[in-house]
Amino acid sequence: MKHFEVNFDGLVGPTHNYAGLSYGNVASQNNAKEASNPKEAAKQGLRKMKALTELGMTQGVLAPQERPDLATLRRLGFTGNDASVLAQAAKQAPAVLAACYSASSMWTANAATVSPSADTQDGRIHFTPANLTNKFHRSLEPEVTGRILRAVFNNDRHFYHHQHLPENDHFGDEGAANHTRLCRAYGESGVELFVYGRSAFDVSQPAPKRYPARQTLEASQAIARLHGLGDESAVFIQQNPDVIDQGVFHNDVIAVGNQNVLFFHQQAFLNTASALAEVRTKFGDGELHFIEVPTAEVSVQDAVKSYLFNTQILTLPSGEMAIIAPTECRDNPAVSAYLTKLVTLGTPIKGVHYMDVKQSMRNGGGPACLRLRVAMNDTELAAVNPACLITDSQFARLDGWVDRHYRDSLALDDLRDPALVMESRTALDELTQILKLGSVYPFQR
């Protein structure tokens, strides 16, 4: 039986825009109110997916959410037909309208937390959609995220789908962006690292002062319980509050892991030595590489600006590892110099591939934000909805679909246009047929 990791990337939705909705996400705030290019954003994402298949990887795709979320606008008191709801919201609450138009579901690292069958008590892959309570625009996602995941992983024998955690900041959960897994091989049991920003029920614990800690210890513990992870399979590590206050809003902005490699910044964690000692103990026998990037070589500011740690580390079919990095890493002198050195250090990472995902980067999401990792075996892969796996023909279908339905410019003023609602629904209705998802969207039900 073969074992591997499959990346399921989020397809950028037709309403991709720069509204600066994410407080604590420096790039999102810095690019607020610029015009976006939804067509180019979607194509950049698709090209990244296609590039990974060309490296020999199995690559999946997850559909975007229906936006605007008119049901939420109506729940907030805007009435009448769709055009009337948009006009009222644009006039009375433009920030709320922008939030209900957000295409943030493209960052599928926040879609869910996934535990592979090698780690779970019942031998199934477990999924829990993230509740994303900390940001209003993202808190609208979990219900439909769950539907999409069930349509992609639609086999009770191999996949177990949980409801998202209670919708309260005490159990604030941001999904796989604060979770990584270390293992000797994908098919062997591993150690799942849950990184949290604060404890909700013990306010004596350290917490950031400037920006919010979006993930709580209690949420991470609940996910581990739901997924049936034993004590030997889970490590809970607090993120350094000081780096959250410097714009590190998720752990995947300051650390990333794959198999027996943990790649992280010197300032990433609060009690680094004890945390890594626990990881090493629970990892057990076998080579384990901790690659710590010193502040003297790459500052936190450069790490955030370039998204050095929001890269993907892939194990290629050859067995060597490679980093998928945004072109911003190549353009940053300190980060570029570090990556050039990294591939010579004798770790499993032997190459770096740069990819252009600028439309996503300007909204605060790099290559790792755009993907949800699922470690699986070939039997489990055979149970995945095949229309949600990228092949040459499916790539061509999706690329053509983007050409037919997406605008090449979207400004905040355009969000009041009722035609955008129909364009988006027409596009998504066709997409559910291409991806064979069934009726996952509210307008289809």
Curated annotation (Swiss-Prot):
Residues annotated as binding substrate: 19-28, 110, 137-138, 214, 252, 363
Reaction equations catalysed: N(2)-succinyl-L-arginine + 2 H2O + 2 H(+) = N(2)-succinyl-L-ornithine + 2 NH4(+) + CO2
Molecular-function annotations in GO: N-succinylarginine dihydrolase activity
SUBUNIT field: Homodimer.
Family: Belongs to the succinylarginine dihydrolase family.
PANTHER family named among the record's database cross-references: N-SUCCINYLARGININE DIHYDROLASE (PTHR30420:SF2)
Role: Catalyzes the hydrolysis of N(2)-succinylarginine into N(2)-succinylornithine, ammonia and CO(2).
Protein name: N-succinylarginine dihydrolase
Provenance organism: Aeromonas hydrophila subsp. hydrophila (strain ATCC 7966 / DSM 30187 / BCRC 13018 / CCUG 14551 / JCM 1027 / KCTC 2358 / NCIMB 9240 / NCTC 8049)
